[in-house]
Design a protein with these regions (language model features):
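Conserved hydrophobic "DFG−1" position in protein kinase catalytic cores
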Residues: 32-33, 41, 106, 126
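Conserved Nudix-box catalytic region and its N-terminal flanking loop in Nudix hydrolases
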Residues: 34-74
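Acidic, metal-coordinating catalytic segment for phosphate/diphosphate chemistry
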Residues: 1-29
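Active-site-adjacent beta-strand/loop module that shapes the phosphate/pyrophosphate-binding cleft
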Residues: 90-113, 125
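Nudix hydrolase/Nudix homology domain
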Residues: 48-49, 119-158
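Short helix-loop capping/hinge motifs at secondary-structure junctions, enriched
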Residues: 38-39, 111-115
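A short coil-to-beta-strand element that immediately follows conserved catalytic motifs
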Residues: 78-87
Length: 158
């Protein structure tokens, strides 16, 4: 018997031995700066907080195609990009998905800055990194976005 619970598969074999196998959803977030050093953030539809654009990878996507799709869906971005994977989160359980998630953070250099709310985005703007710490939110997405910014600064001082 196999069932999915709390983000992992619980399997019991014929002699009663139970095994837990974790399923991981891979999520990508894009750290994009403008020339003033501000960070691109999006407030998705039906959400009350600002976050870095990005989301879960779909089956058979690579990092670049997933980043392009997510940027199009959330911030209306159409164009080429360069990216550098530079950090990963610890495991997070996402109750609405019943899945454990690991988020990979990518510094993204878009070929243009034509950002408008996409089909999943409600508002899009650039903010000073410190403003993320002032966001009141039921989730830690704004603070996590700030930590990602600080990690990039620590590694590359850009």
């Amino acid at each position: 018997m196999t069932k999915l619970t709390n983000g992992h598969l619980v399997t019991q074999d014929s002699v009663g031995v139970t095994r837990h196998d974790y399923l991981y959803r891979i999520s990508l977030k894009a750290l994009i700066y403008n020339d003033a050093g501000q960070i691109l953030v999006v407030k998705e539809i039906n959400r009350t907080y600002w976050d870095l654009p990005g989301g879960g990878m779909d089956y058979d996507e690579d990092f670049e195609s997933s980043l392009k799709r997510e940027l199009y869906e959330e911030v209306g971005y159409k164009g080429d990009l360069r990216y550098q994977l530079f950090d990963a989160s610890g495991e997070m359980y996402i109750e609405r998905l019943d899945a454990n998630q690991i988020c990979f953070y990518c510094r993204v250099w878009p070929e243009n800055f034509d950002f408008i709310p996409g089909e999943e985005g409600d508002e899009v703007m650039f903010v000073d990194p410190e403003e993320l710490l002032l966001q009141k939110s039921e989730v830690d997405a704004p603070a996590r976005a700030y930590r990602v910014h600080m990690k990039w600064q620590e590694l590359y001082g850009e």
